[in-house]
Amino acid sequence: MQQNHMSLSNMIKEVKEVFFHVPALLIPTRYREIYREIDRAPKLLEQSFYTIFIKVWNITEKVTVTDVFYYSSVEDPLGLQSPRHSRWAQNTDEEQRKQARIIIQSVYKPNSFIRITSNKFTRVLITSLFVLTYFQSNGVFQSFPYFESQINGFLFKKMNNINQLEINSTNTCIIKITDLLTHQKSKELLGNSLPTNSILRWKMHSKISDIKTIFNMPEKWIYLPLGLGLENSEQIFSYRNFDICNLTKNSSNIMKIKNNRTILDPKIDKYPLVLKNKENILFFHKLPIQFFLFPYIVLRIWLAPVFVLWWSYQFNSEEKENIKNNLKNIHDIEISTIQKFVAKAITFRDIGGMESLKQELATVAFLLKQKNYSNSYPMGYLFAGPPGTGKTLMAKAMSYEAETPYLYVEGSQFRCREEGVANARVDDLFKQIQNISPCILYIDEIDSIAERREEANKQLEQLKTIGDSIEGSNINIDQKPSDTVLMQFLIYMDGYKKRNDLIIIGATNRIETLDDAIMRPGRFDRQIVFSPPFFEERKDILRIFLRNTKALVDDTTKTMMAERSIGLNGCDLRLLADNILLLSALESRNQQKTIPVINEDTFDRALERVSRIRHIISNYELAFGKYDFYRTAYHEAGIALIHTLLPECRPVYSVKLFPKPLNDRYLEIERENLKVPSSDIISTNNIDYFVQKIVGLLAGRAAESILFDFYPGQISTYLNKTYDPNIQGAYNIAHHIVEFGLLDSVTGVIHYLNSENENNIKDPFVTKINDLIQNKVTLKTNRELRKYSQAASILDFNEFWYEQDYPWQFDFIKKQYIYSNESSRNLDMEIVSILHTLFQYTYDFLKSNEQLLDHLASLVLKNKSISQKEIHLVVNSYGIKIPTKTWKAW
């Protein structure tokens, strides 16, 4: 324990001796503590201006004076959190070093004197004091009295004290005199080889009477301190007036270390007697500062520390000025006021689709421009919809047509933590609007400031219930800052003061989260929901994007592109058109055509770039197994055959052996269509529509069943690894057929259980209805399943098919109905009967036309892909038709 205490004391003592290289009083308080230990070197090196050796807890680094201020400003001055010091952190002496750091921190605390130095005059005085103290401690005034160039002598002196020199290859260098003079013809010519105007030659002749005495000493060494810039010059000892020899960087006595510092190899291993005989070591008595020009002295010595300190304080003052400016203008908001879009004029002709909306907005823009016709028009529009559907583009076109300023702000600009800042920004915004009206204000992402105030309403309801029990107490509700901003917006939009010649357009992606107060007429008179474009709109949008190209596009290709780009919004279509033009240009250049041509292959490659794909198999030939090629060919051929014959199914444009994943937006629309979410869709479509949909979805699985008739275990659940809506989609459609009563069944009359009639389940009338439903469903289900009961018990693939692909026991039965659990299971059996019937019909139809199915599958295997024209030619050659009448016909 005593030994540890002594080691800590010695460590603190060493730091104390070297800590005041820069006076602690002059270190600004904003700098953190610098716990550094200057490397124990000769005093000569310690007084050098150009180099400071800093040792931060056993870490030796070579830095300049500017680096000292850098190291003092970091948050971790000791480097304890640095990755390169992780090994040191695991040292056994870690606790001792932590204690030493705490002790040093208590001893060397930054002085608070700098806190009063807030004005520039005080900073100049302190800077001057620092410069004077620094150069006085380093003996600069002794070398340059009265700013005259007086040169210190180049002195050789013996080192008698062993503590004056510690041999360390990282900061010192000793070189044998005989090695330095090997290139000379004679050692005696050293004095004569020096230039006549060299101060070194004059000093050597004046201080050392007999030069031959030094030359004849075989083991004499010269100690050269590093850090003077000598090691970085091309001819090291020819730097300035030190013309001892021409030892260059490529010499054998010079080596490079990791941090790219050039040092001289002392070669101490070859001369072990040097460390013992200190009398044979010569070193410089003082720094040989040899400058002859006063401007050079000022620039190189005096202005260096002055610039460092001035920069540090100036940086602090500039930072304060920036903070003041930010505090002064914190309530201001940047508004881009554009009278007309001349550079990039956007008109309604540049927007495809939405003809009725464009006509209405064009009328409002005309009324803004010509006030003589009418002063009554919608004062606000709320644009809602997914991103990329043209909300901002429509607002820009409206402002250009009206020739009015277009003000664009973001809703997030009015969400601030500081109290009152957001309200000040709202006031500043509408004050600027009064000066430039009539104008159009476009608020993007308005849901960030117009969220529904549900929390405050809940608190009010709770306080109303307990308000009577609290007498004489003030009840306050803390509102969020966004609520106060919303209230201020509501007042400016339609409050006590009238809003003149200002149309506010708000855009949001989440209209369901908006507050009811901001959506009422008078604030937002019209609420318009933007959706992905339909077929005709996509065709119009692609026409606009491709109108300025020289590529040839026929009408059939345009129709095909509009049909196959389902699910893409306006931004996606613009990107699709750009990729089509790029690929067509590359193809025409490769084929040396003057005019590019846009065909189906170009569209397919462009669509692959636009589509967001989750799963891609790079090499299908390596990934596919033995039966995968045949399974894929028959699966795609069955889908192509059924979809070609049934009018309600989506047409197949091409069949490929290696199916590519669909884009995400296409799949989202497919999921929504297959779910049949509302009765509106059912009212426009009869039972035949849904029956054809189910048959088309089960066609691929039925074709695989024909191929693997004797190997039912090889049948796949789905092939498209991204998402296959076939199996789950067929179950969803059958579920809604039964749920909405499209069949001759009583089950569609009873819908989901409501919370109001939950207590009426035990009512006698409800019990009679449940019994009636149970008997009806049981009779119908048994009648439909009678012809499949034997096959279901024999074939193994039926068990594989139903248990894995139709999890009705996990999803359907969880929903609450007012009938009993037994009747709900019968409803599930009715869904099963629909799927059994339609799957069996699809299987029988493809089995009866197995020759046509084999023909299509062979073409897919041979050509890897077939087009829609080839499919129609093959199907029409066989003259096959499929009945598309009613459910009873199936």
UniProtKB/Swiss-Prot annotation:
It is found in: Plastid, Chloroplast stroma. Signal peptide: none annotated. One of its GO terms (molecular function) is ATP hydrolysis activity. Pfam families: AAA (PF00004), Peptidase_M41 (PF01434). Keywords: ATP-binding, Chloroplast, Nucleotide-binding, Plastid. One of its GO terms (cellular component) is plasma membrane. Its main location: plastid. ATP binds at G385, P386, P387, G388, T389, G390, K391, T392. GO terms for biological process: protein catabolic process; proteolysis. Probable ATPase of unknown function. Its presence in a non-photosynthetic plant (Epifagus virginiana) and experiments in tobacco indicate that it has an essential function which is probably not related to photosynthesis. The protein in this organism is about half the size it is in other chloroplasts. Belongs to the Ycf2 family. This is Protein Ycf2. It comes from Mesostigma viride. The gene is ycf2.
